[in-house]
Regions:
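Bacterial Sec-dependent N-terminal signal peptides
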Residues: 1-26
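Mature catalytic domains of secreted/periplasmic carbohydrate-active enzymes
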Residues: 24-457
Length: 457
């Protein structure tokens, strides 16, 4: 049995490494068409604080991490899903559920995670308490399909993983976010075993089985209440995935008022469900084409997938910094997806890139954090932000991979008053303005990296 499991894992690792990019692009959440501003003053205040942070981490971790495959989606029987040749759908699904008996992150070290991401300059975190597969990364009372009950880690004193993750990040000053999937494919009241499961939604008629749906709504409300009721401390963000089910269908409107008694100003992110419970938008693996004037976040992966995969192809630090500059200039935040390994740590290859990002932010972060949009926000590879007082502007030159810094930077509009400070090394340089065009000659000796400038208007 163990040999068979190992063979299956090796086979899957190779297959899904090749398929990861295809799967990633086959289904991503687009942003909602519109935005509804919340009316609660505490939520508005929390959103303003969150918009100061700019850079966060979104951690996917669960059963899918064991073989290193696309998170949850492989048990969804849709046309774009890739599984090993010859495997039956039901056989594969049972194999996947069986990973709950294998998942054993003996090196689980949330303090290491918090150190790594704080050093990377990240200011908020979102952790997957439950993905679509239904496997709970917290000690829920409402199902045994959880890390705290189903497998070998159930005997570990840190079996209530979400609690230990949240508790490790709070002392570092992070805003704390709980990811929760509204669909639960393991729950019999969502995918009932009496019927086949051909698609991601419920597999029965609610009109014919209203009691089943009521059971599911109660189950979901109970789990959300567990997470937000105080047992896991004060939360800042409730990040709800699975936009084919709306929050109000599963009782979110009843949960939030009680949750906000424990966590005043709790930001609700009912993804892609335009309305009062989507307090910020979340375009996935993309950046909006233009500036937006309401709260939003691009959630994007460091590698090719959300969870850990073997031999990942990571984005460079330079690329992440350039994307972060574009996002902040357009008014958003970046939640960067980094998945812990099956045994519970952040892998070294990811740490190297994150350290490089953090080193840049320690020198140039003034051009990112606590900024707001300005009317003229882009000129070629230059992205502009403004300080909150509107009197100081920042420009970040997004240096592409494989290219060297130019000797000078030029742009139109946003005319500096006085000298320009190069945040990378703190030196002041002259800005030459002629016919509405600004030219800044860069000082010698700069590292070959994105450049951040600061100047007054």
């Amino acid at each position: 049995m163990l040999t068979t499991m190992k063979q299956m894992l090796l086979s899957l690792a190779g297959l899904f490494a090749a398929a990861a990019l295809f799967a990633q692009n086959s289904f991503v959440h687009e942003q909602s068409d519109g935005y509804v501003w919340p009316e609660d003053p505490a939520v508005l205040e929390k959103l303003d604080q969150w918009q100061d942070l700019k850079f966060g981490v979104l951690m996917h971790w669960g059963l899918y991490s064991v073989p290193g495959i696309v998170e949850s989606w492989n048990i969804c029987n849709e046309d774009w899903i890739t599984r090993p040749e010859g495997s039956t759908y039901e056989g594969y699904k049972q194999w996947y559920w069986g990973l709950s008996k294998v998942f054993n992150p003996v090196h689980f070290n949330p303090e290491q995670w918090a150190d790594v991401f704080a050093d990377a300059g990240m200011k908020y975190m979102i952790f997957t308490t439950k993905h679509h597969d239904g496997f709970c990364m917290f000690d829920t009372q409402y199902t045994d399909f959880s890390v705290a009950k189903a497998g070998p880690f159930a005997d570990n004193p840190k079996k209530d993983i979400a609690k230990y993750v949240f508790d490790a990040f709070r002392p570092k000053g992070f805003m704390i976010g709980a990811y929760f999937s509204k669909p639960d494919w393991h729950c019999e009241w969502f995918w009932n075993p009496y019927y086949a499961t051909p698609r991601r939604g419920i597999n029965y008629s609610v009109e014919q089985h209203p009691d089943w749906w009521k059971n599911y709504v109660d189950f979901t409300k109970n789990q959300l209440t567990e997470l937000t009721g105080g047992r896991y401390g004060r939360l800042d963000i409730l990040w709800l995935d699975g936009g084919w089910i709306t929050g109000d269908q599963v009782g979110l409107n009843e949960v939030l008022p009680e949750a906000r008694k424990v966590s005043p100003g709790l930001i609700s992110v009912d993804r892609t469900i335009q309305g009062p419970n989507e307090n910020y938008q979340t375009p996935e693996q993309s950046v909006p084409k233009t500036q937006l004037k309401h709260p939003w976040e691009s959630c994007m992966t460091l590698g090719t997938d959300w969870g850990w995969t073997p031999n990942p192809q990571f984005k460079t630090a330079r690329r992440v910094i350039g994307t972060l500059a574009e996002i902040t200039a357009k008014g958003g935040c970046l939640a960067l997806g980094v998945g812990p390994t099956p045994d519970g740590v952040i892998e070294d290859k990811a740490i190297v890139i994150l350290q490089e990002i953090g080193a840049w932010l320690r020198r140039c972060g003034e051009a990112i954090y606590n900024t707001r949009i300005t009317d003229h926000y882009n000129d070629g590879r230059l992205w502009f932000n403004a300080a909150k007082d509107g009197k100081t502007l920042y420009a970040v030159y997004a240096l592409p991979d494989g290219e060297n810094l130019p000797a000078e930077l030029t742009w139109t509009g946003n005319l500096p008053k006085g000298k320009v400070t190069v945040l990378n090394n703190g030196k002041k340089v002259k800005a030459v303005v002629k016919d509405g065009q600004v030219t800044v000659k860069l000082p010698k000796g700069l590292a070959n990296e994105p450049i951040a400038l600061k100047f007054s208007l």
